Structures are given as C-alpha cells and as structure tokens.
Amino acid sequence: MPMSRRLRWYLDARGVDYEVLPHLRTQTSLQTAREAHIAPERLAKSVLLEDEQGYLMAILPASRRIELGRLERELGRNLELATEPELVERFRDCEVGAVPALGEAFGIRTLIDDTLLVAEDIYFEAGDHEDLVHVNGDSFRELMADAMHGSFSLPQA
C-alpha cells in the first residue's frame, strides 16, 4: 500500500515540504527506526485512544511508551486503546499499525508528547509498513500548532 492519500492531500494542502523514504517492511516502530537508520527519538508513532468523548491520537517518540494512567489523570478521561476494527474503519487508506502521526489529517484530536517538539527532524509512518514521511522540525511544529501537548511518556524498558 502506498502513502495514505489523505495524508498526502493534507500535507500538500498545507504546503509542507516533505519526502517519502522507503524502508524494508517492519512491524514495530523500533524496527522501523533501525531499518531506516534514524534515531528512535525522531520517529513519531501514533497511539489511537478512545472513551465516551471520542477518539484521541497520542503522538510520542518510538523510543518511549505511553503512560496511560498519567495521561488519564491529566485529561480527566477514562481512555483505552482503540480496537483493530476501529482502526481499519477510521484509517481506510492505512495499514493497521502504520497510522501516520498526524491525527488532524484524519479529523482526530491530537495530543503530542513534549519530547517531540524539540527535534530538528521528524519521521512518521506514511500509512504502510514500508515508507516514512520526513519533515523538518519547524514544519512538524506548524502541523501540530492546534494539537494539545504534554508529558505523558516514559523511556522504553
């Protein structure tokens, strides 16, 4: 599956300079960082969460894991991971596990971990398990201008 059409449209409509980088097929974000020869701190991964208020996309570095309890306390919400059928339905032009870390491109409220806001370059899934999108840090911060942000992750064990 090539780059998500919706993602491409979103980036193009905003005039963002980006490049699509192919890599060998991977199943985890840490594998992707290794295959693409990039620091896991610069690979943004998405985690789709939900509760009675709706969906929320949490974006954090591949080198970190979400601290769900902390996030729930900060937001005053009772969040859980979205199910695979929900991912398939919500991201029709993406493979499961390769959802781009740009929730707003898909009409989903987004929360970004503060650790990503200082990076010079950011990479994220293009919608498949074989391509990454690369943008510079300033462009990424502009894309995230309307996103909430906070500290809700811990280093991978």
State what each model feature region is:
Residues M1-A157:
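Extended, low-hydrophobicity, polar/charged segments
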